[in-house]
Amino acid sequence: MHHALCNVIEPIVDRTFVDSCYANRIGKGTHKALDHFTALARRYRYCLHADVEKYFPSIDHAILRERIRRHIKCPNTLSLIDAILENSNEQEPAAHYFPGDDLLSPYDRRKGLPIGNLTSQLWANLYLARADHVMAQRFGGTRYLRYVDDIAVFSDSADELTDARTLLKDELALLRLNLH
């Protein structure tokens, strides 16, 4: 069922991803990401490497649903997606607070995707797509790359990478995510 669903939605959402988003994409696997990373490492003096803390367990269902609904309009497909999300892994309480939260917000929000499902991998790329666009626009699509939840930005300026980390943290906070 997950493969059939991905066959329907992947062509719709994949075209919205930046070119430097790797993993779980046709023609954009580990080797392509490593080649891109290596080329950038040889060209630039500094690299910001960032990792999203507990990425799959932290994906917020309400935010993910909103992202999915921007691209998928078929009620039957959305119903299937909702069923998959509702029946996904049990949630572990995580006391991460974000601007606007009340005391119970971290416990009231359903989170998490099972790592092995094909739908989870596609949705993980979609979840970070807006952050990818913001980072690629600010730092150039050729100096930014992401492989699942591992993010790299390259520059000849350490100060620019400090700015990149701040911008990335701000974008991730909008998704209720933290950096390691």
Locations of regions flagged by a protein language model:
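Conserved polymerase palm-domain catalytic core
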Residues: D19-S20, L34, A39-V148, A152-L179
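Active-site beta-loop-alpha junctions of metal-dependent nucleic acid enzymes
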Residues: R25-T30
